[in-house]
Amino acid sequence: MKRILIAIIILLSSAHYINAQVETPTMGWSSWNTFSVNISEDIIKGQADAMVSQGLKDVGYQYINIDDGFQYGRTAEGKVRIHPKRFPNGLRVVRDYIHSKGLKAGIYSDAGDCTCGSISNGDTRNTNVGFYGYEQIDADFYFKELEFDFIKVDYCGGNHAGLNEKEQYTAIHDAIVNTGKNVRYNLCRWAYPGTWCHDISTSWRTTGDIYNGWASVKGILDENLYMSAYCYGGCYNDMDMLEVGRSMSEEEDKTHFGMWCFMSSPLLIGCNMANIKEQTLSLLKNRELIALNQDPLGLQAYVVQHHGETYILAKDILSLHGKTRAVAFYNPSDREVEMYLSFSEVDLGGQVTVRDLFEHKEIGTMEKGMSVSVPPHATRIYKLEAETRLDRYIYEAETAFMHDYQEIYNNQSAGTAIYEKTSSASGGVFAGWLGGRRSNSLEWKDVHIAEAGDYTIHFAAASKESRSFNVVLNGEELRRIVVQTTDWGVFKEYDITVPMNAGSNAILLYNENGWMPNIDYMSIEKSGENTILNRRLEETIGQLEMVSHNSLLTNKLRQNAEQLIKKATAGNLLNSQIKTLLKDSKNLLNTINQLIPTCIEYHYWKNYSDKNIEASQESTPLNTLKTKVERCETSFLIATTQNQISTAIKSLKTALTTYFHEESAMPKEGEQFDMTILISNYDFSSEDGWKGEPTYRSGCGEEFNKTFDLHQILTNMKPGIYTIKCNALYRTRNNDAGAAYKAGTENIQAYLYANEKKVKIKSLYSETWPNASLFSSSDNLNGYPHSMHAANIRFAEGCYQNELQYSHTERGTLQLGLKCNNYINDNWCCFDNFELHYQATKDYYDGITSVQHSEQTAQNDTYDLSGRKYTDDKNNTKEIVIKNGIKILR
């Protein structure tokens, strides 16, 4: 069944990996993401034309895959009938056309009785068209008669028919083998089916369906970070079709495509290739990234470093255990992060030449390590060529193969092992629920040693009760290790010393009679040497040096890092001292990773304070604010805990809020205060602050199919001119493609308001959406946003800006928000990013000018706000006046 390009040599006794070339991941295009079931002969032929004309064929894309939507029931003989309107000439003519372009053709089916389109997309003729009960008939039709080269087999019908995945997918495999044809067979079960899938297919889906959005890409990557052990022998973890070139940002698209390449996932383009954007086309044709995906080793990258929310992954390319490796710095967080890699972490030594595979340029030659600044949601991928290759000294459990691993059924009910996350594990993940039978075991299949000899192996394990595991080296039983620690997440090392062969070794852990302890990692060093401690110390020093120069951190945290560096580089350290240093450094680095987001928040509010101070005219409240801000800065610089930094932030915000309410706190003429801080949850990042009942999702807010009054009441607001801004769009009824708006008859009765003043919210149809065609119908209807996700994308682009200016004549409350008193069914309002700005009235500045002009002759005169001289009339009530250029109460 498996198609082999170059002979693969596998030592079946222990499944060792040997330096060999294998069939590489599938590259092509699939119809589903853009066209769903609404496909046709012309569409498929057009995409084949586009693959060639856009130069995609030239860089390796070759499959044109027809997904769901071509079926139309079955004939009396049981053969799948082809949809007469979508494919009036049948599929053979389409397949021939694809082949005539020098491309390969793919088809779709379901393991059960019906397809997903018949269930989720209303394509009712797609019932009874799955493989179930017609395995050999369909295999002969698709591969002997129509001669398709690839098939994706879904499982909606399999669920519907209550089938067993392993049995049914194997039956389909056997039917395909019976045709005698070479076919790429993709399983689409939306979770890793089990290790059995490697024996019958060329790729298998590991997650639910991808969708056009960063959250989907991030989630799929998260589920595949620890799947490297299951990618081997020309068979691959399928992370689903590509959503590149649709609605995500440039950095998100780069992460999406770059990581799919790096993880050796099949690359199936999902957008319309006929109108693909130039930027997207350039990314999809990046030959250096594609080379990682199509590397002859066929390996998936594994995690070598995990700090905070960031990951560094690595894999061999070109030759196993050679001097050339690829690394990816992956930052899924919402902030820019400085990341550091010690070359020791990727088993490289000496001078290392670094090449940027996104930018196609040499970065230079480095020693020890490299530091990279990675924007939010971004990835940087490099090729490293080193002088020497070091033995790998740490093998995390999450890189090992679990023989009974599966993700379809509850692992506890099935009695199968899983990978679990915990902060106490070395890499943040451990292997648990092992044992109970021989097959529920853990194996590192390629433990490579440069020189034969005696080696000490350290197993980090945890178990609150006494548990054990047996160690097998290259098929030979070594010994049983008994483990008991103070808790399930408290890991302790258990050692054995054994002779090991030069080259590849396999180490298996099992317990066939009882549960095993949780396994964190295995580390290896030549007996009598301190390889592990020395390399860990070198890696830690690099991390500490990066931290010591991080301007986001407090001075005290940087000083603590510098002190540890000084101790670590003192020389002649005892092993006990190194262990203490490593422990202290790990604690500091963990603390810093936890504190960085709070440090960033502090800097945000400090910069916000500085900008408002810069905009302020001199006054006593301003001097008070400056003093308070300086105190906050002093407190921040010596802070080492979350509470201390949070207190500094709270003090900053309180000082600003107090200042804005001071009567004599005023901006300079021509300047304005940014008072957005007075609005709670101004960016809809949480679910509080606003009265009314909005829906919070996708980073914005929504009101749908109702009247509403979304508002906040700000108290003790001083007189002046307030400007309220927000992103907001309004649709009066269901989407009519803007017919009423274009005719000038659209009646919007929804408003942005401040007290009694209001302005109509911008119509949904008031702004065109140039990239609407890149979105599916769930986000784009008639060329306009049709979801909160789509609206938020447009808001981020600066669209649908609403603004209202309100003159507040006396101190009191300011109620601001969005409201609709009358509505028609399906009205929709989406909103985000409220801002509040303040400036004094012209009369105020005129008064100051008048006072300054008169000071030379009337230093002690007092003037009202309009600049008129104040007379001491005992009948006058107290009021705000200006004396010697300063506002006072008289």
Predicted feature descriptions by range:
Residues V337, L348-Q351, T379-R535, E539, ...:
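Extracytoplasmic
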Residues I6, G847-R890:
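C-terminal outer-membrane/trafficking sorting elements
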Residues K361-E387:
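Intrinsically disordered, low-complexity Pro/Gly/Ser/Thr-rich segments with frequent PxxP/GP/PP motifs
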Residues I43, Q47, M51-G162:
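Aromatic-lined carbohydrate-binding/catalytic grooves of carbohydrate-active enzymes
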Residues W260-M263, L268-G270, H306-L348, H377:
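Carbohydrate-binding surface patches
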Residues N128, Y134-I137, E167, N182-N272:
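Glycan-recognition surfaces
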Residues P25-S31, G60-D67, K104-S109, D149-D154, ...:
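Structural recognition of the beta-strand scaffold that forms the well-ordered cores
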Residues E529-N572, K586-A639:
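Amphipathic, heptad-repeat alpha-helical segments
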